[in-house]
Amino acid sequence: CGGRVVKNVPGYDLDRLAGGSRGTLGVILEVTLRLLPTESDRCGVLAGFPTVAGAVDAAMRLRDSYPTLHAITILPRTLLPHPTEEPVALLVSLRGEPEYTAAMKLDLLRELPEGAFPCADPIPMSSAWDEVLRGGLTIAALPSRCGALLAEILTAREPGFPYVLDILSGCMRLAPPELTRFEDEERTLAPLLSRHEAYGERGGDPTFHARRARVFPEQKWDGLSLMNSIAKTLDPAGIPMRGRRDF
């Protein structure tokens, strides 16, 4: 997009397409919708890492080795009600029949560092999680770049800065300490996002789009709006279906 060629990729995830294309959409020639059965079991595996880079490396390996994983999320230990010993947590979410999830948990525990353990999913989060969801700045990048981007963003911030990174889509949520400083935050991040070919957006703010146009004048957003419209058509009830709409 933006001078690039949009390739045909069978089985591409709607959420990944919205993030991976930087919000700009090519011409859709054909759409195939595959409906998957409702999962009978929901669970996950949680592991701790000393650095974001280590967690991202492990997450990328899992993504490539186990394409049926429901979600792979990286977040600071401070967002967990029962923190891991390491400062960075990696949560792998599983959905499916009990036989499948039981076998996957064993495989993941062998793949992840010692100290990883099975957990419920979704797991209870601390109050800081609500702060991220209410006022967070959403940033999307190619999954292969989001680890380096997040590491750079965190370099200039205090330990425990709230963030949530979804490895499968390349989308992350940040919660600046002072939500009134979003415009300064966006201007500070603009060169960094441009270097990593990423974009940022804050929802629930009627003035955000006008400010975004000043901060990121080169970005085009009509594609993201179109993808959101498609998602709303497929899921009018607003039920979270990450990784469940295959195109």
Which residues make up each language-model segment?
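A conserved active-site cap/scaffold subdomain adjacent to cofactor or substrate pockets
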Residues: 42-44, 48-51, 57-118
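Active-site-proximal beta-alpha loop/turn segments in soluble metabolic enzymes
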Residues: 35-45, 85-91, 169-173, 208-213
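Solvent-exposed residues in well-ordered beta-strands and their adjoining turns
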Residues: 32-36, 48-50, 95-97, 142-144, ...
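Hydrophobic side chains in well-ordered alpha-helices
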Residues: 1, 55-62, 101-105, 149-153, ...
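FAD-binding subdomain of flavoenzyme oxidoreductases
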Residues: 1-68, 73
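Short gly/pro-enriched beta-turn/loop segments at secondary-structure junctions
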Residues: 12, 39-42, 67, 84-89, ...
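Short amphipathic beta-strand starts and helix->beta connectors
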Residues: 27-32, 65-80, 123-125, 155-162, ...
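Conserved glycine-rich FAD pyrophosphate-binding loop
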Residues: 110-247
